[in-house]
Amino acid sequence: MLTRKIKLWDINAHITCRLCSGYLIDATTVTECLHTFCRSCLVKYLEENNTCPTCRIVIHQSHPLQYIGHDRTMQDIVYKLVPGLQEAEMRKQREFYHKLGMEVPGDIKGETCSAKQHLDSHRNGETKADDSSNKEAAEEKPEEDNDYHRSDEQVSICLECNSSKLRGLKRKWIRCSAQATVLHLKKFIAKKLNLSSFNELDILCNEEILGKDHTLKFVVVTRWRFKKAPLLLHYRPKMDLL
């Protein structure tokens, strides 16, 4: 079968962040226009702006952070195309935890990286559109994972209700994976309170509404840094934003 070779720099524009000009890390997409950036770059930009950095469309007049979402598919593509990128990012994270004297989470202790499998084909800035390693990976039977994210970095949370229209949780203290999202918490609260829909809830940190795709790790780093555990979050009935 014929294969087509593509120069890596020919697709750089599609896998780099317009704000930092580097390869996408923790890829995050604007839901209005589907332009993608590094999460940290986009969040920092939206602290003082409410438009997309690329097309300048207004994301939301007052709460643009609620209209961005983690793009796992794009991040997987970037890691597969750019040799060594995921290993380098994991190494930086480990160094960060070591510097602070904190235990390295289980999900970043190893350096398993699918991009490493493609290293030889990328040495000259080229990638094969039809890579046999993808076929081999697809043929492998996935191993059953019964860990339920227990080996992930864990976050302790206190869920408080700040509305008289909702009742408080019997057990407001929970501990879960740092990779869990605000959406997971909404579903958890809705189930415990027997609400008809989790979309009826807002979750806040420091009186700021959190986007449904924010991971707890992201919330801790950007909203609770240098504060003692547990992470304090409040929930209330959803309020329509003008």
Curated annotation (Swiss-Prot):
GO terms for biological process: random inactivation of X chromosome; regulation of transcription by RNA polymerase II. Residues 132-242 are annotated as: Interaction with BCORL1. GO terms for cellular component: nucleoplasm; nucleus; PcG protein complex; PRC1 complex; X chromosome. Its main location: nucleus. It is found in: Nucleus; Nucleus, Nucleoplasm. It holds the Pfam family zf-C3HC4_2. A zinc finger (RING-type) spans 17-56. One of its GO terms (molecular function) is histone H2AK119 ubiquitin ligase activity. InterPro entries: PcG_RING_finger, RAWUL, Znf_RING, Znf_RING/FYVE/PHD, Znf_RING_CS. Residues 117-140 have a biased composition (Basic and acidic residues). CDD domains: RAWUL_PCGF3, RING-HC_PCGF3. Residues 115-149 are annotated as: Disordered. Keywords: Metal-binding, Nucleus, Repressor, Transcription, Transcription regulation, Zinc, Zinc-finger. SMART domains: RING. Component of a PRC1-like complex that contains PCGF3, RNF2 and RYBP. Interacts with CBX6, CBX7 and CBX8. Interacts with BCORL1. Component of a Polycomb group (PcG) multiprotein PRC1-like complex, a complex class required to maintain the transcriptionally repressive state of many genes, including Hox genes, throughout development. PcG PRC1 complex acts via chromatin remodeling and modification of histones; it mediates monoubiquitination of histone H2A 'Lys-119', rendering chromatin heritably changed in its expressibility. Within the PRC1-like complex, regulates RNF2 ubiquitin ligase activity. This is Polycomb group RING finger protein 3.
